[in-house]
């Protein structure tokens, strides 16, 4: 085990000099004793002359030149398997929930090759989420990748927590949650939410929160992914939740300049597409088992053309776009039904009825969007009878796309609803065919199935 010495410390980036014949490999882990703490460094570059440039997986405060650094001769390894369920771990797989050792039987390196093309499997099976707007407009595939896109404060994390709750309870598989650079409060809320709904023993939690150094945030997604890969390779269908994939990119940006790379567009790292690809190519389903992943993607300044969200788009099967305009109308989940897409929305996959209903809903909402200008200038009275009907139905559909969430019961005071896909299609089809033209639009707001809307109308 070779030993080197620290020669330079710049923030999270540490240069270490080793003997010429014992230079560590790229991605090898190094350990340094920093006071009472053992700090792990990960090799990023070999600079020549026996010097390697590393990123610290923790705070580099207190490091000084001349400290001894040991080469561990393997990449960062984390616990995998059933022992991780119900536990909260950090980027190195160390428990941070004060419940003692993990007691794992096996450890895996966080840097692994993606499965080969022969091993990949293609599934057409749908994953029902119980959220009307998602199941209808942008259905998820089992073993597919989903992105939740949204600016600040439109409900990415709440949507994700609802998805985890619904899928964990209805689907009863294992899940891995990687909190990448998000709020500590959300991590705490999430843990208690999982405990209260009795699904904590089916979830492994890996946190690298906002207050952590960039090294932790850059690698914590890989730690969570490695745990999910282990479950997949045991032949299970596992769910991987990443909140937030943008912070993974951002952590890369923070260390990129310190590593001496020239910035590219908007100041991002030049290796943006490659870093994203390395992560996304591993999140995939094989013939052995499947990983269904849901990733929250923060959209800076609500601009979907920003390089980070734009790079993420390319890897996804379904995109759920959360819109500030819809949130401002008080419609939650604030999913934009005209902007959200899914590869599964194909008559050969979801069936003709589902496809026609979804497209019908989109065309009515699109027509309403076009008529809004006329209404704003001339008022409703100037519309033809046919257009008045379209507007009335569109407003009902818009309200019926809202739904009370289980995880938001505390804030809204109304109990959460899980709506099956069959009921969702039936409800929207009925509105489009005019079966509910006699009901006031307020009856459709924040209800589950169409029967509830009919009941609510009686009370209004």
Swiss-Prot record:
This is ATP synthase subunit beta. Keywords: ATP synthesis, ATP-binding, Cell inner membrane, Cell membrane, CF(1), Hydrogen ion transport, Ion transport, Membrane, Nucleotide-binding, Translocase, Transport. It comes from the Bacteria. GO terms for cellular component: plasma membrane; proton-transporting ATP synthase complex. Its EC number is 7.1.2.2. Its main location: membrane. The gene is atpD. InterPro entries: AAA+_ATPase (IPR003593), ATP-synt_VA_C (IPR055190), ATP_synth_F1_bsu (IPR005722), ATPase_a/bsu_AS (IPR020003), ATPase_alpha/beta_chains (IPR050053), ATPase_F1/V1/A1_a/bsu_N (IPR004100), ATPase_F1/V1/A1_a/bsu_N_sf (IPR036121), ATPase_F1/V1/A1_a/bsu_nucl-bd (IPR000194). CDD domains: ATP-synt_F1_beta_C (cd18110), ATP-synt_F1_beta_N (cd18115), F1-ATPase_beta_CD (cd01133). F-type ATPases have 2 components, CF(1) - the catalytic core - and CF(0) - the membrane proton channel. CF(1) has five subunits: alpha(3), beta(3), gamma(1), delta(1), epsilon(1). CF(0) has three main subunits: a(1), b(2) and c(9-12). The alpha and beta chains form an alternating ring which encloses part of the gamma chain. CF(1) is attached to CF(0) by a central stalk formed by the gamma and epsilon chains, while a peripheral stalk is formed by the delta and b chains. One of its GO terms (molecular function) is ATP binding. The lineage of its organism: Bacteria, Pseudomonadati, Pseudomonadota, Gammaproteobacteria, Enterobacterales. It is a peripheral membrane protein. It is found in: Cell inner membrane. It catalyses: ATP + H2O + 4 H(+)(in) = ADP + phosphate + 5 H(+)(out). SUPFAM superfamilies: C-terminal domain of alpha and beta subunits of F1 ATP synthase, N-terminal domain of alpha and beta subunits of F1 ATP synthase, P-loop containing nucleoside triphosphate hydrolases. It comes from Shigella dysenteriae serotype 1 (strain Sd197). ATP binds at residues 150-157. PANTHER family: ATP SYNTHASE, ATP SYNTHASE SUBUNIT BETA, MITOCHONDRIAL. Pfam families: ATP-synt_ab (PF00006), ATP-synt_ab_N (PF02874), ATP-synt_VA_C (PF22919). It is an enzyme of class 7 (translocase). Produces ATP from ADP in the presence of a proton gradient across the membrane. The catalytic sites are hosted primarily by the beta subunits. Belongs to the ATPase alpha/beta chains family. Gene3D superfamilies: 2.40.10.170, Bovine Mitochondrial F1-atpase, Atp Synthase Beta Chain, Chain D, domain 3, P-loop containing nucleotide triphosphate hydrolases.
């Amino acid at each position: 085990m070779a030993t080197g010495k620290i020669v330079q410390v710049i923030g999270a980036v540490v240069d270490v000099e080793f003997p010429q014949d014992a230079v560590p490999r790229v991605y090898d882990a190094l350990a340094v004793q920093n006071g009472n703490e053992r700090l792990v460094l990960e090799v990023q570059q070999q600079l020549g002359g026996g010097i390697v440039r590393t990123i610290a997986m923790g705070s580099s405060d207190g490091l000084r030149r001349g400290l001894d650094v040991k080469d561990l001769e393997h990449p960062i390894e984390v616990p995998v398997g059933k022992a991780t369920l119900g536990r909260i771990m950090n980027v190195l797989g160390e428990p941070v929930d004060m419940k003692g050792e993990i007691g794992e039987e096996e450890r895996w390196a966080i840097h692994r090759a993606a499965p080969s093309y022969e091993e990949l499997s293609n599934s057409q099976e749908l994953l029902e989420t119980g959220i009307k707007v998602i199941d209808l407009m942008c259905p998820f595939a089992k073993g597919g990748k989903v992105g939740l896109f949204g600016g600040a404060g439109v409900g990415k994390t709440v949507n994700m927590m609802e998805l985890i709750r619904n899928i964990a309870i209805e689907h009863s598989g294992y899940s891995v949650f990687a909190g990448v650079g998000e709020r500590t409060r959300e991590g705490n809320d999430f843990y208690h939410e999982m405990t209260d709904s009795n699904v904590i023993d089916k979830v492994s939690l890996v946190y690298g929160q906002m207050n952590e150094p960039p090294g932790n945030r850059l690698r914590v997604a890989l730690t969570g992914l490695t745990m999910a890969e282990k479950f997949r390779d045991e032949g299970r269908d596992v769910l991987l939740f990443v909140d937030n994939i943008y912070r993974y990119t951002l952590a890369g940006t923070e260390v990129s300049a310190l590593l001496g790379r020239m910035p590219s567009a908007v100041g991002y790292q030049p290796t943006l597409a490659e870093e994203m690809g390395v992560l996304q190519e591993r999140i995939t389903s094989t013939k052995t088992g499947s990983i269904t992943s849901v990733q929250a993607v923060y959209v800076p300044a609500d601009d979907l053309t920003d390089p980070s969200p734009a790079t993420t788009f390319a890897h996804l099967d379904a995109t759920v776009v959360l819109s500030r305009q819809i949130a401002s109308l008080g419609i939650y989940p604030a999913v934009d039904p005209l902007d959200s897409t899914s590869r599964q929305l194909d008559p050969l996959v979801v069936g003709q009825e589902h496809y026609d209903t979804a497209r019908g809903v989109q065309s009515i909402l699109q027509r309403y969007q076009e008529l809004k200008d006329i209404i704003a200038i001339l008022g409703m009275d100037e519309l033809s009878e046919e257009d008045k009907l379209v507007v009335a139905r569109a407003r009902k559909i818009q309200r019926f796309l809202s739904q009370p969430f289980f995880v938001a019961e505390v804030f809204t005071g109304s109990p959460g609803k899980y709506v099956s896909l069959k009921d969702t299609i039936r409800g929207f089809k009925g509105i489009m065919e005019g079966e509910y033209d006699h009901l006031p639009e307020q009856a459709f707001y924040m209800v589950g199935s169409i029967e509830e809307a009919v009941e609510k109308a009686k009370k209004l």
